[in-house]
Amino acid sequence: MKYIAAYALLVLGGNSSPSADDVKKVLKSVGVDSEQDKLDALLKNLEGKQLHELIEAGSSKVSSLSAGAGPSGGAAAAGADAGAAEAEKEEEPQEEEADVNMGDIFGGDDEDY
């Protein structure tokens, strides 16, 4: 993921065809080490492809995953958890705000604000 992020930053920054050295420089600038074999494999797979096409392809794959998932049986449990969380919220003591004289830190007169 770090390689793809660095590649995308370079493309969005105006470098239409980032090299392995370009990606390494970006990663090194934020203190991340890179593995040459993984970087070479990524650049080989991305060769000749536009970033916006890759993003569209990835988005369609992600949306197909969420569309195929059916509802889980966790809806009833979520309702029970909400009741428990509500009970916890009621138990918290509320703190009152105190009028505190801040020692006239803004240089005004001695009146209370």
Curated annotation (Swiss-Prot):
Residue ranges with Low complexity bias: 74-85
Regions of compositional bias (Acidic residues) in chain numbering: 88-99
CDD domains: Ribosomal_P2
Keywords assigned by UniProt, alphabetized: Phosphoprotein, Ribonucleoprotein, Ribosomal protein
Post-translational modifications: Phosphorylated.
Location of region: Disordered: 60-113
Gene Ontology MF: a single term: structural constituent of ribosome
GO BP terms in the entry: cytoplasmic translational elongation
Keyword Ribonucleoprotein: yes
Coiled coil spans: none
Domain of life: Eukaryota
Keyword Oxidoreductase: no
A cellular component annotation (GO) from this entry: cytosolic large ribosomal subunit
Recorded family membership: Belongs to the eukaryotic ribosomal protein P1/P2 family.
PANTHER family assigned to the protein according to its UniProt record, in alphabetical order: 60S ACIDIC RIBOSOMAL PROTEIN FAMILY MEMBER (PTHR21141), LARGE RIBOSOMAL SUBUNIT PROTEIN P2 (PTHR21141:SF5)
Function of the protein: Plays an important role in the elongation step of protein synthesis.
Assembly: P1 and P2 exist as dimers at the large ribosomal subunit.
Official protein name in the record: Large ribosomal subunit protein P2
Organism of provenance: Euplotes raikovi
Taxonomic lineage of the native organism: Eukaryota, Sar, Alveolata, Ciliophora, Intramacronucleata
